Amino acid sequence: MKNNNIDYSDYYARGGKIDKSIPLKIRKEIYDSEGERRIDERAIEVLTEYAENLPQTKELNTSKKTGDYYPERKKLHEKIMDTFKEDLICIQNDEPIAILMGGSPASGKSTFLRKYAPYLLKEEILKVDADEIRAKLPEYKGWNATQTHQETKDIVNTLLSDRTIGIPCKYDIIYDGTMNSTKSYYPLIALLKKLGYKVFIVYIDKVDEEVVKKRALERYKKSGRFVPMAVIDDFFTRGKSALNELKDKADGYMVVDGSGGDYKVIERGGMRLPKRRAYSKLGVPIVELEKQSKMESGGITQNSTPDYLQMFLGK
């Protein structure tokens, strides 16, 4: 029989131990007596305020004098980015494609992709997802996405810049964003088109704000991954103005009804996003290209370079 006199808020939460780096006063507000994460209005308010007042990880890991990340942190960023690139396929036999996802947090973007075009979730394509990136930062604990926001954004911006795209080859890209502003999308689309990409927009629509909030809170209760309610509020306040501006800039777009489980396409224009992509026939693994480049720099002759790699190496 459970001892109801014991305060379990300092013991275990579902999915792991309670984070004891959080002050006890705060823990008592955000966990119940059994160590479960609370998702009532008061608990979420306390958690949000606490997380928002923590120093940004960017601030903690950059030089006050230069504003640059410390060398060790730069190495971490490189390592994080490399993990998303190690299984990419260099596109040789077709045009590379880029998919720009839009829609609110917890709108079901991954669920739609799994149903419509599962290849978009494979490791052969560069997936740029802020949540997956911040999860690799050592300070990230699920509930403190706000604290990692600026640093995560810097890594995302690097992955979506000419410092990464097209180097050392062109590979397919999917960017999982909200598309609540055009600011970062205009230069990205311009860069992609300059490099010869076909650009597609996929936007998940028709998901009620209260449904999104409920999903986000239930996900936090189960996994500890927290999305501040203000982020969701901001998305719905802005509406689809960015989508309406950007969709004509893409080679093709689709708007999907995410209110049910069938994910029907309710609007589309331009080219159709391929439902299948056979990467084994489209090119070569990026690791082979990088290995060959190292061999070239080591003095291996052109005649020893396989024909299928010579085009990438400018032979």
Question: Which positions does each model-derived feature cover?
Answer:
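Conserved glycine(s) of the Walker
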Residues: 108-109
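The conserved Walker
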Residues: 104-105
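Conserved nucleotide-sensing/catalytic segment adjacent to the nucleotide-binding pocket
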Residues: 122-191, 195
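Short hydrophobic/aromatic beta-strand immediately N-terminal to the Walker A/P-loop
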Residues: 99-100
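C-terminal accessory extensions appended to soluble enzyme cores
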Residues: 5-96, 249-315
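Hydrophobic positions on the alpha1 helix immediately C-terminal to the Walker A/P-loop
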Residues: 112
